Amino acid sequence: GLIMVENVCVKYPEGSNGTTQLRLDKDCYIPRLFTLTEACHRQGALMGIQINHAGASAMSSRIGMQPVSASRFPSKAGGEIPRGLSKEEIESIAKDYGTAAKRAVNAGFDVVEIHAGHSYLISQFLSPTTNDRTDEFGGSAKNRARFCRMVIDEVRKAVGPRVPISLRLSVDELVEGGNTVEDCLEYLEYLNDEIDIYDTSAGLNASIQYQIDANYLEDGWRSYMAKAVRDKFGKPTIAIGNIRDPKIADDILARGDADLIGIGRG
């Protein structure tokens, strides 16, 4: 199987969103992560790492500065107002993702996943609910996807052609005015060529019950999102979300909704 180490910070403290969050913003973190990957490899597992920048989901009380984002929208109701990033800062952060990805490969990870969902920084650019920019990073689907495209390009340049890149995204944001499945498929047209795997999640902080699945939601309820992406682009997809019954997991795979099943609580 594939073990995914999630939510690893690419820029500290600005991009941090948790006191126990792992980091890959410095070389000093490589040795211990290499110990982890080697231990898992010895047991026959492949290792993936998910790299992330919190954006407006960071808290000034912890990071010591105003959070940053695409625009001046909080990532959740009552949250802090971030400042919009300059073009130069956007370019710099994209390079931070690439540098973190290079460190990940040096630490022995087999797959690098870019987190582009769940109201984190890339999501804040992709979603029209948090991006009202009037420059080349806002407005159209292509423009809102531009920062994500820059990140993907930097990661690909860092890891080379043989390391798979996974993209985790909120395929259906499930909020008023947010990206629908159809909107997601549109902006993925500008990202697809360098993506090897799609990790198909859902929701924003404003629809947290779909992002961190409420227990009343049916097992495998998100699989329609994995199927939509798989049907459109013909690439492997990961179905996730309340998959508690092994039979449901088998059914999702058997009917071709997804190629892989992601389970975060066994």
Task: Locate each region found by the language model.
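Flavin-dependent oxidoreductase catalytic cores
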Residues: 1-266
